């Protein structure tokens, strides 16, 4: 591994201090560095690495921008995923999809072919399971390619440190990098942030609450791997099956807590942060458990997730952020976020990850007579579109744009809460950042013949958290 990636792990204060200096320097990069896009051309080409549902959605968001951008290469480890995404995107965008067979790449090194199909000023989309994020980002930096990467971007301390180090190189090359934490591009939340901090409508922020309580989500719960002679598309090996069921495995997604709750955690930390600052909790404690370990048909689930989480995050000034997550059929659904201050409160996301209307209230009772402000229909925008608008504008006009440090810290904060619940310990953000356990340390070496990063026992069950018993690692 490169010496650059073996640097002494940073603590939280050093990172925040350093990142502040880097951001300050990058603000001058447009003056000091050459334009990143080809002179005389606004055409941006895009390569899609990871052709699942979110990958197809990100490519669609990219091609919906002015210009318009064109999709020129695709990569995945599953042929049927690539074919499905290609057909769907070709039907929708026709002439904007220019991906002949020789620019369709299959395999664990397929990302190299896709990125090599681009020129400087173009964009690689990374929407694979997060274990591969640093691998793909490193190669894009080497090739001088701009990036859009999906959240979360890390699931453990070692990959968080690695991504922060890699991003120093991306900044030095003036690369533009977007991260799929789209809440900060939602207009109603941008207006709410201003009303909280510039207008002081609810006073000092002291409490935040996020709830994502739904039924079965994604691939969070998995029955036993059916074996090599299975009837699934492509007859996947255990490694390939785990990739296809990525929500079930901490190495591939950070598990359900990380993948499903990162948006609320990110935008609530934003609501705590004054303009120009990025505040994150300093510690967390939490509880969680798995009530049901069988499918409705009575077959055992073997994944690594809990079905309920309740995490308390604490900020340096004592403010609290509570994040409650539940994946349970028949339970009351809740999918909202709230901010409480010394004078009143706010609804951040009324529904979903960041859907409005957002609103502010005097006091802490939600009522029409207490309402001070609510966002209007003009703010019912699409943040997935907005984040690409910002990225493509930065590329074409050489504006500073790099969301990786924030993406890493939002992902790390989410992992902090998950770790606290899985171990039943109070854990600091410094401890999480500097933890030595890496879920998939050889992600850059995986091939179709590789064993899966986490192995089942003789009965087909994967190692799961045991709070209070396993306290130094999550399993």
Which residue ranges define each predicted feature?
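N-terminal secretory signal peptides and thylakoid transit peptides that target proteins
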Residues: 3-23
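N-terminal Rossmann-like dinucleotide-binding module
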Residues: 22-96, 268, 471-475
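Loop/turn elements at helix/coil->beta-strand transitions in domains of secreted/extracellular proteins
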Residues: 42-45, 67-70, 100-102, 119-124, ...
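Predominantly a Rossmann-like dinucleotide-binding segment in NAD(P)-dependent oxidoreductases
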Residues: 50-55, 173-178, 183-303, 311, ...
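Glycine-enriched catalytic-core subsegment of oxygenase/oxidase enzymes
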Residues: 61, 68-75, 89, 280-475
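A structured beta-alpha segment of the ubiquitous adenosine-cofactor-binding alpha/beta core
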Residues: 92-126
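Beta-strand-loop-alpha-helix segment that lines the small-molecule cofactor/substrate pocket
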Residues: 130, 134-185
């Amino acid at each position: 591994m490169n010496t650059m990636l073996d640097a002494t792990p940073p603590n939280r204060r050093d990172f925040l201090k350093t990142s502040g200096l880097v951001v300050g320097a990058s603000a001058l990069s447009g003056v000091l560095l050459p334009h990143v896009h080809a002179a005389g051309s606004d055409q941006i080409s895009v390569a899609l690495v990871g052709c699942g549902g979110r990958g197809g959605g990100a490519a669609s968001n990219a091609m919906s921008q002015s210009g318009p951008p064109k999709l020129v290469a695709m990569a995945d480890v599953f042929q049927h995923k690539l074919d499905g995404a290609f057909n769907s995107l070709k039907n929708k965008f026709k002439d904007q999809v220019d991906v002949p067979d020789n620019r369709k790449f299959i395999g664990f090194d397929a990302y190299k072919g896709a990125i090599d199909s681009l020129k400087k000023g173009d964009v690689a989309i990374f929407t694979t399971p997060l274990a591969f994020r640093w691998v793909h980002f490193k190669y894009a930096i080497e090739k001088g390619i701009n990036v859009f990467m999906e959240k979360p971007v890390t699931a453990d301390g070692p990959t968080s440190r690695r991504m922060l180090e890699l991003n120093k190189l991306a900044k030095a090359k003036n690369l533009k990098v977007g991260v799929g934490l789209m809440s900060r591009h939602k207009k109603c939340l941008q207006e709410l942030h201003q009303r909280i901090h510039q207008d002081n409508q609810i006073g000092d922020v002291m409490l935040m609450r996020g709830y994502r309580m739904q039924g079965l989500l994604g691939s969070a719960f998995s029955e036993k791997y059916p074996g090599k002679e299975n009837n699934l598309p492509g007859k996947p090996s255990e490694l390939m099956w785990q990739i296809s069921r990525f929500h079930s495995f901490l190495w591939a997604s950070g598990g359900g807590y990380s993948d499903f709750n990162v948006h609320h955690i990110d935008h609530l930390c934003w609501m705590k942060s004054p303009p120009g600052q990025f505040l994150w909790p300093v510690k967390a404690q939490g509880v969680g458990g798995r009530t049901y370990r069988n499918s409705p048909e009575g077959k055992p689930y073997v994944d690594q997730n809990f079905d309920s989480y309740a995490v308390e995050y604490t900020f340096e000034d004592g403010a609290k952020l509570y994040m409650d997550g539940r994946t349970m059929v028949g339970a009351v659904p809740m999918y909202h976020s709230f901010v409480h201050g010394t004078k009143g409160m706010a609804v951040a996301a009324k529904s979903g990850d960041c859907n409005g209307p957002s609103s502010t209230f005097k006091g802490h009772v939600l009522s029409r007579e207490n309402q001070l402000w609510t966002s209007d229909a003009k703010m019912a925008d699409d943040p997935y579109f907005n984040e690409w608008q910002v990225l493509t504008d930065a590329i074409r006009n050489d504006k500073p744009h790099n969301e990786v440090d924030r993406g890493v810290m939002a992902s790390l904060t989410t992992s902090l809460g998950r770790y606290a619940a899985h171990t039943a310990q109070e854990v600091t953000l410094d401890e999480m950042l500097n933890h030595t356990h890496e879920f998939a340390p050889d992600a850059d070496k995986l091939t179709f013949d590789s064993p899966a990063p986490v192995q089942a026992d003789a009965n087909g069950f994967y190692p799961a958290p045991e709070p209070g018993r396993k306290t130094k690692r999550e399993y």
